[in-house]
């Protein structure tokens, strides 16, 4: 909330007459420390998966009021072109784009998930695209639908026009869960090369975000550069999952060093996933990442502040917490506890300490 400015000129005059100095902190407007769109969240399951219930207006309003200025969402290719490339069902994406536009929250779509007909190995859902051109054509259809001249905006003039200008091409291709055929470097570079051409033909001002890299991400980034990837993306992306807060900054710095070595010192970086799960004592096999809910909240605040303090030096354009809402019920998956909020079994939502930490951090960094 903005601080009230109670007649600062008159108050200063009265203090001057009394021989006292005016207190500038009471009159000063809160100072924004980060650019607009810097604090974001990932709308992961259960609200971001288009095969489920999609995003709800009430939750997106809660995002906006708590300081979320960018929302990363999954656009699953397999949902839009399940049966073949001839036609695209935009229904799941329309719902997401419409809800975000209605609540004036910018989107960063991550486009992934190969339909069976387009896979290298049709029986493996994690298999990569057999032909980059198929993915490129799908990306073109998304720009035609949601870009500056998109058909979605013509059909929904009741909505604020919020065209999508930034697209993230895939997620963690260095992980077999998302790209089964390893090593992935050459095939992934071919994919983003074809997709970027298709996107820019339809929107010359569009920007392409590299897939978020995980683990020893700086090593993976170097491999992408060596495979010729440099000219095919406009933003770097990294997922600095680590046990220690200090290692988050170190991982981001390592990626910046690699980018600089390959001539991309000025290319901006997005931290498209940052998290610690509040899974301590909740899963059968404890992991090094497990934290209590209060630990999770304090790490969130410290990590956002640490990255904000170094955002200019490291070229960090935005940071996304993963995730907005999780179930917090799994006995085997720590990442089911990463949410700022928890979805109860009865369908109601509980705000966790991390939610309030995010909101307070956003108010401070965004000058609210």
Question: What is the role of each PLM region?
Answer:
Residues 34, 50-53, 136, 140-165, ...:
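Noncatalytic carbohydrate-binding groove/subsite architecture in carbohydrate-active enzymes
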Residues 27-69, 74:
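Boundary/entry segment of secreted carbohydrate-active catalytic domains
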Residues 51, 89, 118, 163, ...:
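Aromatic-rich peripheral "rim/lid" segments of glycoside hydrolase catalytic domains that contact
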Residues 42-57, 78-91, 117-118, 174-178, ...:
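Acidic-and-aromatic substrate-binding clefts and catalytic sites of carbohydrate-active enzymes
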Residues 37-43, 69-73, 107-111, 165-169, ...:
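Hydrophobic faces of well-ordered beta-strands that scaffold small-molecule active sites
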């Amino acid at each position: 909330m903005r601080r009230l400015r109670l007649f600062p000129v008159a108050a200063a005059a009265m203090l001057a007459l009394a021989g006292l100095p005016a207190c500038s902190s009471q009159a000063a407007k809160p100072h924004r420390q980060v650019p607009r769109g810097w604090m974001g969240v990932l709308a992961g399951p259960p609200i971001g998966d288009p095969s489920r219930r999609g995003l709800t207006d009430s939750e997106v309003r809660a995002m906006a009021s708590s300081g979320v200025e960018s929302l990363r969402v999954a656009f699953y290719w397999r949902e839009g072109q399940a049966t073949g490339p001839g036609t695209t069902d935009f229904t799941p994406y329309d719902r997401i784009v419409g809800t975000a536009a209605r609540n004036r929250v910018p989107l960063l779509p991550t486009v992934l998930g190969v339909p069976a007909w387009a896979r290298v190995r049709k029986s493996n859902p994690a298999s990569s695209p057999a032909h980059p051109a198929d993915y490129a054509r799908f990306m073109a259809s998304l720009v035609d639908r949601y870009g500056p001249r998109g058909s979605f905006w013509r059909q929904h003039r009741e909505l604020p026009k919020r065209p999508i200008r930034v697209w993230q091409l895939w997620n963690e291709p260095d992980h077999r869960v998302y790209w089964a055929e390893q090593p992935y470097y050459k095939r992934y570079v071919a994919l983003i090369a074809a997709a970027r051409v298709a996107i820019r033909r339809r929107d010359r001002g569009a920007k392409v975000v590299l897939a978020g890299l995980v683990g020893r991400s700086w090593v993976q980034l170097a491999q992408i550069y060596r495979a010729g990837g440099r000219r095919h993306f406009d933003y770097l992306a990294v997922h600095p999952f680590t046990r220690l807060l200090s290692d988050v900054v170190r991982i981001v710095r390592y990626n910046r060093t690699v980018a600089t070595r390959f001539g991309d010192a000025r290319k901006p970086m997005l931290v498209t996933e940052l998290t610690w799960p509040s899974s301590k004592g909740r899963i059968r096999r404890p992991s090094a990442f497990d934290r209590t809910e209060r630990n999770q909240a304090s790490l969130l605040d410290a990590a956002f502040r640490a990255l904000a303090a170094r955002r200019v030096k490291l070229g960090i354009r935005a940071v996304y917490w993963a995730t907005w809402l999780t179930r917090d019920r799994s006995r085997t998956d720590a990442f089911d506890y990463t949410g700022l909020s928890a979805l109860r079994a009865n369908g109601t939502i509980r705000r966790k300490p991390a939610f309030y930490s995010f909101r307070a951090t956003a108010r401070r960094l965004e000058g609210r």
